[in-house]
From Swiss-Prot:
Family that this chain belongs to: Belongs to the HAD-like hydrolase superfamily. NagD family.
Domain of life: Bacteria
A GO CC annotation given for this chain: cytoplasm
This protein's UniProt keywords: Hydrolase, Magnesium, Metal-binding
The protein's role, per its UniProt record: Catalyzes the dephosphorylation of 2-6 carbon acid sugars in vitro.
Top-level class of the enzyme under EC nomenclature: hydrolase
Cofactor(s) required for function per UniProt: Mg(2+)
GO molecular function, one term: phosphatase activity
Keyword set includes Cytoplasm: no
PANTHER family: 4-NITROPHENYLPHOSPHATASE-RELATED, HALOACID DEHALOGENASE-LIKE HYDROLASE DOMAIN-CONTAINING PROTEIN 2
Protein name in UniProt: Acid sugar phosphatase
Cited InterPro entries: HAD-like_sf (IPR036412), HAD-SF_hydro_IIA (IPR006357), HAD-SF_hydro_IIA_hyp1 (IPR006354), HAD_sf (IPR023214)
Name of the gene: nagD
Provenance organism: Staphylococcus haemolyticus (strain JCSC1435)
One Pfam assignment: Hydrolase_6
Amino acid sequence: MKNYKGYLIDLDGTMYLGTDEIDGAAQFIDYLNNHQIPHLYVTNNSTKTPEEVTQKLKEMNIDAKPEEVVTSALATANYISDEKSDATVYMLGGNGLRTALTEAGLTVKDDENVDYVAIGLDENVTYEKLAVATLAVRKGARFISTNPDVSIPKERGFLPGNGAITSVVSVSTGQAPQFIGKPEPVIMDIALDILKLDKSDVAMVGDLYDTDIMSGINVGVDTIHVQTGVTTYEELKEKDQQPTYSFKDLNVAISELEKNAQK
């Protein structure tokens, strides 16, 4: 395995599995920290703030800082702010998205007379919220969605994800949204801009082929698949585009890096 100068790292299925630690995850981050190798956590989760994400990582014995976290909510706020710094936004979503939008200097409104509609995972979604979002898009608001995941793994099983909620507005208006999160290039380009490294020196690490691995492939960075989450090695072998590497877990990645260091 190549020694990269920076890493973009997925969370659920890579750093932890729900509320369980994944063997090798904390050790991999310790290795990066000890060797002063920059890395960012890139997540499609829009409900949490970077501080909340960091707190969960610390509970998993992973040493992380809020400034190392790029959520789809942060990327969405960044994207809108770059297009129109004084934009008004109608949003569906949680505290993570609302905080990101307001901290970016954007105005969150509760009616359909807005510049943008931003949809993130909203566990308290109602018909009225979807109705206002639909009316706003029909009136010409730019239609943004934090991430396309149609289902999310929870303790009860796979539940509707943000892509499922977004599809209601999309089907009703006949308009496709601009998705921000993985596997779209938007969130990856923002993360790469923060790292300020050549793409050839960066690897994307993740478990889920359709989001994590494809996000790396879509922006032209190497990819490291870990067999600790959703996509199994057997499923991976059936894919047309293969990751650069696939490891049983991140302990194997550490061993590979240590071998290179001894050469």
